[in-house]
């Protein structure tokens, strides 16, 4: 809704300039959309990080700890470290590819 007489927003062709009357609402809508996208991105990042930790814990434990006991041997510690690093490298490659694809889609 315009705060001025609608005839003052008419162009010389007699059409109203809708960008000047809807601009505040449009900007607010864009801000809400951006806020929602940011919130969703943060929630997805948290969920993905949780899934990564779960996957690393589950898979590396199963692979490296053959007989559970009170302490871990140096071999088990090294195995867990290497396993964790492998998953982190994979995570980074996949994340970079995913982010690149999302950015590419946003620019088209």
UniProtKB/Swiss-Prot annotation:
It is found in: Mitochondrion inner membrane. It comes from the Eukaryota. One of its GO terms (molecular function) is protein transporter activity. SUPFAM superfamilies: Tim10-like. A motif (Twin CX3C motif) lies at residues 60-83. Disulfide bonds join 60-83, 64-79. Transmembrane segments: none annotated. Residues 1-29 have a biased composition (Low complexity). GO terms for cellular component: mitochondrial inner membrane; mitochondrial intermembrane space protein transporter complex. It is a peripheral membrane protein. The keyword Zinc applies. Keywords: Chaperone, Disulfide bond, Membrane, Metal-binding, Mitochondrion, Mitochondrion inner membrane, Protein transport, Translocation, Transport, Zinc. Residues 1-34 are annotated as: Disordered. The keyword ATP-binding does not apply. One of its GO terms (biological process) is protein insertion into mitochondrial inner membrane. It holds the Pfam family zf-Tim10_DDP. Heterohexamer; composed of 3 copies of TIM8 and 3 copies of TIM13, named soluble 70 kDa complex. Associates with the TIM22 complex, whose core is composed of TIM22 and TIM54. Interacts with the transmembrane regions of multi-pass transmembrane proteins in transit. The twin CX3C motif contains 4 conserved Cys residues that form 2 disulfide bonds in the mitochondrial intermembrane space. However, during the transit of TIM13 from cytoplasm into mitochondrion, the Cys residues probably coordinate zinc, thereby preventing folding and allowing its transfer across mitochondrial outer membrane. Mitochondrial intermembrane chaperone that participates in the import and insertion of some multi-pass transmembrane proteins into the mitochondrial inner membrane. Also required for the transfer of beta-barrel precursors from the TOM complex to the sorting and assembly machinery (SAM complex) of the outer membrane. Acts as a chaperone-like protein that protects the hydrophobic precursors from aggregation and guide them through the mitochondrial intermembrane space. Belongs to the small Tim family. This is Mitochondrial import inner membrane translocase subunit TIM13. It comes from Candida albicans (strain SC5314 / ATCC MYA-2876) (Yeast). The gene is TIM13.
């Amino acid at each position: 809704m315009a705060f001025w007489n609608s005839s003052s927003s008419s162009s010389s062709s007699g059409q109203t300039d809708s960008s000047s009357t809807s601009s505040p609402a449009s900007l607010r809508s864009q801000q809400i959309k951006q806020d929602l996208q940011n919130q969703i991105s943060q929630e997805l990042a948290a969920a993905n990080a949780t899934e990564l930790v779960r996957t690393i814990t589950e898979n590396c434990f199963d692979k490296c700890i053959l007989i559970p006991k009170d302490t871990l041997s140096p071999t088990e510690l090294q195995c867990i470290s290497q396993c964790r690093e492998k998953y982190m490298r994979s995570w980074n490659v996949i994340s970079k590819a995913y982010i690149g694809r999302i950015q590419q889609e946003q620019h088209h």
